[in-house]
Amino acid sequence: MASSLTKFDTGHEDLIHDISYDFYGKRLVTCSSDQRIKVWEFIERPDASVWELNDAWKAHDASILKAIWARPEYGQVIASCSFDRQVKIWEEQTVEPRNSQKRWAERFRLVESRGAVLDIAFAPTQNSLRLATCSSDGIVRIYEALEPTNLAQWSQMEEFEISSANIHRPIDADSGYCIDWCPNRTAAPMMVVGLGKEIGARIFKHDGHNRWIPSEFLPGHTQEVHDISWAPSMARSYQLIATASKDNLVRIYKLTEQHLPLQQQQQQQQQRGRVPSSPAGTPTQSGAASKSYHIELIASFDDHKAEVWRVEWNITGTILSSSGDDGKLRLWTTGYDGKWRQMASITANTQVPSAS
């Protein structure tokens, strides 16, 4: 099947920080240092397929670092975050004309961050609309829409510090934190967090009692992790996490569940610096927090030869995309022998399959 690239001019007046497809791949949101968000729709025509502008508007008072879509069951909903320390929730108003700058209405602002909001991620959970935010103040905050059909009411449910050593670092917009939820069904929620200037990434697990516990560390990085992505498992017996790093490498980690004795699990948690306790002060074990994973670095690629800024899995977790300062989007997949390889390298004008 032939493949093609569709190039279009976004019309942004400054650097584009992020682009994001909706669940079906028919819509695209772009955000920029020009403080504007633009929503695009893919229109298929007999002569040519094009991306048409749905609307564009000034969304923040500083550079917008990320814009993402909520799952489609909650309607047409976008969240955006910025250097202005705010996260905003936007909802499409189909009664408003396209390109009227009124098509997308602001429903709520999350303003608890004391520094730039560097990353955001909607939780994969069903029956509740949750959003995690990651700020330069070193705190991950988790919010929930009190009524998913009414996006004007959100509440902060939980928060945790990224540093497991309780180090209070100065608020630095260049701290480089990033987050992603585990998209797979587990006993309790999990997420993976890029540790910024502490170098590396760590899994955090919910203990079932409103606490997030620092857990397994993803080793091997020599500089900051710019982006992180947890793969859908699609019935695999193991899980995969990919990282994009300032040290020019794309890494893929394999997580295999271990069944350790309870005492050994508690010892590991004590070594990490925090053990969840009940109100009586006794250690508790619940859900995913009681499970341990063996972490294995199974692939490391330096093909970008430059800083890597983004990694993302496809919906089945079988293809990984990465992009970096070399101006290329690279696609990675595994062969029958279980080894990961580059399957394509995409530039603005051409697609050149890699040599096998």
Where are these regions (language model features)?
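Loop/turn segments within WD40 beta-propeller blades
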Residues: 19-26, 68-75, 121-128, 178-188, ...
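WD40/WD-repeat beta-propeller blade-loop signature
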Residues: 15, 24, 53, 63, ...
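Beta-strand-rich domains and repeat architectures in extracellular enzymes and scaffolds
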Residues: 8-35
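WD40-repeat beta-propellers
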Residues: 37-42, 87-92, 120, 140-145, ...
